[in-house]
Amino acid sequence: MIRLLAGVVLLLGVFTNAALAGQVVPGEEHCVVNVRSDDRLNLREKPSAEAPVVARKRYGDCGIRVTGQCTRGWCPVEDGHVEGWVNRRFLAMVSPSLYCVSKVAAGDTLNLRAWPSSQSRVLARLRRNQCDIAFLPFAKDGWQKVRVAGWEGWVSRRYLSGE
């Protein structure tokens, strides 16, 4: 019974993260997705692929706010410097900060790393029961990209719990 319940909770977490990856919500922060690493997402002056480019964003760039309703697949956005339009298929919403560090031994910490690898440089150490961790829409091989206390980095997902 416990295994069944744990499986359901795990699946809900996977589906919740997947749902956020496709969700675009006005007023919320989003990240750039579905762009090759050697390419850039164009922020355009108007909602058209033919409109002039006002800025370019890399895959994984976050801090992009959708400022209004999307129209015909195009969303008005701003990044703190410029305003423009992007196609919604290149945006994924950042999760609310609902996750906490768990399953870490008393007195131990969870390493926030630069890349999804246990060999990667440690950026910060997260204490047991530390909360307000937001999932960014990127995951790889059991690692989750997160934002916490002003840091962005990767943690092993098995040490996080939340909604």
Task: Report residues per predicted region.
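A structural signal for short, hydrophobic beta-strand segments that form beta-sheets
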Residues: 26-37, 65-69, 101-106, 132-137
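Extracytoplasmic
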Residues: 28-29, 38, 72-74, 81, ...
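Bacterial N-terminal signal peptides
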Residues: 5-14
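Fold-core signature of tandem repeat domains
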Residues: 35, 41-43, 57, 75-77, ...
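Sec/Tat signal peptide C-region and signal peptidase I cleavage site
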Residues: 16-21
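SH3/SH3-like (including bacterial SH3b) beta-barrel domains
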Residues: 45-68, 114-138
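Boundary regions of SH3-family modules and the immediately adjacent low-complexity/disordered segments
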Residues: 22-29, 55, 64, 78-102, ...
